[in-house]
Design a protein with these regions (language model features):
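Generic structural motif recognizing short loop/turn segments at the entrances and edges of beta-strands
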Residues: 12, 34, 68-73, 78, ...
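Conserved SGNH/GDSL esterase-like catalytic core that processes O-acyl groups on lipids
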Residues: 37, 47-133
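Alpha-helical cap/lid subdomain in secreted, periplasmic
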Residues: 103-219
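N-terminal secretory targeting modules
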Residues: 2-66, 70
């Protein structure tokens, strides 16, 4: 299973959810066994610091029992919500990942093999904003159903509170967990990881100076 050694961390964070949220997650581990091709869909919370996909793929490759050949593609739009993304076009586009150019300027071509898993996040306030919450649930369900019909496991990435608005942690945790339970989808509790890290390791700054986006350490924590 992807990042087995990190599954223990997920379990501990889900236990923390009983402290920060009144909702218990129904799905606590991924259904996919060692997904080789992962699509990440989101916004600047994902693409800051050269992208969360880079530390994630390094973590996967550092876990020898997972083998080789993992690919992660990141599709982001700054400031976007789930409603901005045409997920169907992403998973059906045969040109995504179809080539690479190495350091010697050699073009390598690849066959499109599709995706095993798609990790999605909404805008930082959308799940808790009174004028966006319904759309969060609508598109969480729409995208999840589409992915499942195409044999791709959907995963929601719970985002974190703004540094100066810690009350967002509980609010976001509840809405993401409810959406996950409604759609039978795993939620990776990144927001809870931020909360726990700041309590346990206050000397590590997880935030960019704007108090919203991740620092390098925050991006690495999101990947883990």
């Amino acid at each position: 299973m992807i990042l087995m050694r990190i599954s223990i961390t997920l379990i501990l964070l889900f236990q923390l959810s009983t402290v920060f949220s009144s909702v218990t997650p129904a799905v606590k581990e991924p259904k996919s066994e060692n997904p080789k091709s992962i699509l990440m869909i989101g916004n600047s919370f994902m693409y800051y610091n050269n992208g969360v996909h880079n530390p994630l793929v390094r973590l996967i490759r550092a876990t020898e029992e997972l083998g080789k050949g993992h690919k992660i593609r990141l599709i982001t739009i700054n400031g976007s919500s789930l409603s901005w993304h045409d997920v169907n076009s992403y998973i059906k586009n045969p040109n995504i990942g179809s080539f690479s150019i190495n350091s010697k300027n050699v073009l390598n071509k690849y066959d499109f093999t599709g995706f095993d898993m798609a990790i999605m996040q909404d805008c930082s306030q959308c799940p808790i904003h009174p004028e966006r919450k319904d759309l969060f649930y609508e598109y969480a369900e729409k995208h999840s159903n589409l992915l499942k019909k195409n044999d791709i496991e959907p995963v929601f990435m719970m985002t974190w509170a703004y540094k100066d608005k810690p009350e967002m942690t509980k609010q976001l945790a509840e809405e993401y967990t409810l959406a996950g339970n409604k759609n039978n989808v795993l939620v990776t509790p990144v927001g809870l990881a931020y909360k726990n890290s700041m309590k346990t390791y206050p000397e590590i700054n997880l935030y960019h100076p704007d108090n919203r986006h991740p620092s390098n350490a925050g991006t690495y924590l999101s990947a883990a």
